[in-house]
């Protein structure tokens, strides 16, 4: 049966379709932080995130990255391949910021010599703890070959994204990815890519991402609209 709600997330609701291997993602006008401890309805956010993520995933597909994205259905909806999500948040950092800067007691804005890939165990009740490769193996989340592939693919995606954002005068500071197994057991990129799960700074150091909400820096949808308009120039 199609159009049955199967999952409610912080930013999206997931529904069944007529194809058991395809799902419909519906983006919501909700902003959260601290694993949902703070929630706000922000009108227009769902439309912007769907448009931005669809645009990015289309470009990643064209570049040969295996993703779950099929197509954008409407302003707030998209079709995705159904995946078995790997319970890892994969974070790539190009520049010191956020929790990374806080953890090591350093200032934000330091360009890292090489990008750093981090893993966080995707478990809300544990506040998504920072884990290493050995923890991933112990928890049987992924094997060594799969860990290596996820890291390599994350680094490749970073190179593509950095290049695209440089073209529109935005610096990609860091971002979070999620991967999953498709129906054939292949690991593919899932979830979304939007200013909700990355940090972007303009040439003046202004935040063009969800930090505008986290730090009460201004109008979130106005910032996301600027990011969308810039991406549409690519």
Curated annotation (Swiss-Prot):
One of its GO terms (biological process) is 'de novo' IMP biosynthetic process. Keywords: ATP-binding, Ligase, Nucleotide-binding, Purine biosynthesis. It comes from the Bacteria. The keyword Transit peptide does not apply. Pfam families: SAICAR_synt. Its EC number is 6.3.2.6. It catalyses: 5-amino-1-(5-phospho-D-ribosyl)imidazole-4-carboxylate + L-aspartate + ATP = (2S)-2-[5-amino-1-(5-phospho-beta-D-ribosyl)imidazole-4-carboxamido]succinate + ADP + phosphate + 2 H(+). Pathway: Purine metabolism; IMP biosynthesis via de novo pathway; 5-amino-1-(5-phospho-D-ribosyl)imidazole-4-carboxamide from 5-amino-1-(5-phospho-D-ribosyl)imidazole-4-carboxylate: step 1/2. GO terms for molecular function: ATP binding; phosphoribosylaminoimidazolesuccinocarboxamide synthase activity. It is an enzyme of class 6 (ligase). Belongs to the SAICAR synthetase family. HAMAP family: SAICAR_synth. PANTHER family: MULTIFUNCTIONAL PROTEIN ADE2, SI:DKEY-6E2.2. This is Phosphoribosylaminoimidazole-succinocarboxamide synthase. It comes from Streptococcus uberis (strain ATCC BAA-854 / 0140J). The lineage of its organism: Bacteria, Bacillati, Bacillota, Bacilli, Lactobacillales.
